[in-house]
Amino acid sequence: MNIYDQLQAVEDRYEELGELLSDPDVVSDTKRFMELSREEANTRETVTAYREYKQVIQTISDAEEMIKDASGDPELEEMAKEELKESKAAKEEYEEKLKILLLPKDPNDDKNIILEIRGAAGGDEAALFAGDLLTMYQKYAETQGWRFEVMESSVNGVGGIKEVVAMVSGQSVYSKLKYESGAHRVQRVPVTESQGRVHTSTATVLVMPEVEEVEYDIDPKDLRIDIYHASGAGGQNVNKVATAVRMVHIPTGIKVEMQEERTQQKNRDKAMKIIRARVADHFAQIAQDEQDAERKSTVGTGDRSERIRTYNFPQNRVTDHRIGLTLQKLDTILSGKMDEVIDALVMYDQTKKLESLNN
């Protein structure tokens, strides 16, 4: 099947989806309705571009016809030639865009994410850097119009982040932030360093797609849920009513503790969101590890401990080691202006996928 047959098949399926989504039987089936809605949303951009491409093809045909019929009218002929030139350039652009749009899509790209950041090697300095990363992602989310909600956080004695869990919601969040998982290294002079020596510390980032209950159902028998009193600074109990929730997925040992909210039900709901994402991610990671050979063509190895990026403060430099990108814009990037880095990662990933399809 050539590219045009593929595109026509996508458009035909898109129109079929529109009819299915107005079918009362489909509307009443929540799981199927969500699956079809997601499929329609995932193909919408491709169909829109394909329809615009067909209009450009028609414009080229009309312009060529106009040139034939314009004998004796130099002004009309010149206008038609200019339109033909512009349309041919647009045709080439659409063909490149459509090739990329036809690449196999990550089914998680349109999802919200659970973001986890932890201070790793480097003690207090690592925790402070984890806080810097949290601020960077919060500010980037603002530029994208996303909602950023801290669900759980643990702060150390110097105000750094030992661990933070956040939900980032909005349009195509996972598609842009999925490349952030891995070890982020910082090189800078700590505030406590009296001799001006540069120290190296590390924070780790984990990005997981939000998993809806209809997509991944955890058997209640596999969960152990403990209710306890939330604790404040110094460990004292801050609530007379037990509202904090500890949730353990028994088969994997994955544990979530939640006490940010004032009610037990809200803490339970948030804990369930996180544990569902972590358990689904755990099994997805196992499946991906079994397909290592296929994943070498994409950005990085997928190893969660892989050092993906270095932030060098003395040189105001950020280096992404996976794609060899170096930018002397550390201050700009940490202020949330991450587009240049993320766009480069997306382009690299798409290029590698195109190459693998052509080989």
Curated annotation (Swiss-Prot):
Keywords: Cytoplasm, Methylation, Protein biosynthesis
General function of this protein: Peptide chain release factor 1 directs the termination of translation in response to the peptide chain termination codons UAG and UAA.
Keyword check for S-adenosyl-L-methionine: no
N5-methylglutamine modified-residue sites: Q236
Location in or out of the cell: Cytoplasm
Gene Ontology cellular component terms for the protein in this record: cytoplasm
UniProt keyword Protein biosynthesis, yes or no: yes
Protein name: Peptide chain release factor 1
Family affiliation: Belongs to the prokaryotic/mitochondrial release factor family.
One MF term in the entry's GO annotations: translation release factor activity, codon specific
Reported modifications of this chain: Methylated by PrmC. Methylation increases the termination efficiency of RF1.
